[in-house]
Amino acid sequence: MIKTKKDLREYILADESRYGKRKHALLGWFFGDEAYMTLKFLKRLRYTEYYFNTLNKKNPFKLLRFCWSFFLYRRMWDKYKLQVPLNVVGPGLYIPHRAGGVYMNAKRVGKNFIISSGCVLGAKGDADNIPSIGDNVECCIGSMVIGKVNVGSDSIIAPNSVVIKDIPGG
């Protein structure tokens, strides 16, 4: 959870480091670079998490700042088809391809998580039956993790697979 500006910097640097050395931001914007757009979304996600966690309802400026950031975040959510909820994903999230959409409804996702396009982390039935993902996990293209499933650390979920039972770490 991002509670201080130091945490915010660490999360953003961890996310950016997963994408390697980037070109100038203006070139990424002009040519519509996929990694640039994804990093832009991740930065907005992290700032919105920070504003939400430090929200003081007595201070109207902080409330306004959070509302504006949340508006921009939801706009990018719809535009890029990346449904990543607040305060769920750890530092170092990497989304190599966002073309098919990414849908996350998880309890917790560990650090250095890789999720490709068309992946679904979803509930089965009620809202309590949602997956929990460990550290250094990779979800390949089209994979699904459905229900109250614990995926252990250092796991790889194969392309187009459906996970409905726990996966041990290793």
Feature names for model-found ranges:
Residues 80, 85-86, 90-97, 102-106, ...:
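Left-handed beta-helix
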Residues 1-80:
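Terminal amphipathic alpha-helical/low-complexity segments used for targeting or macromolecular assembly
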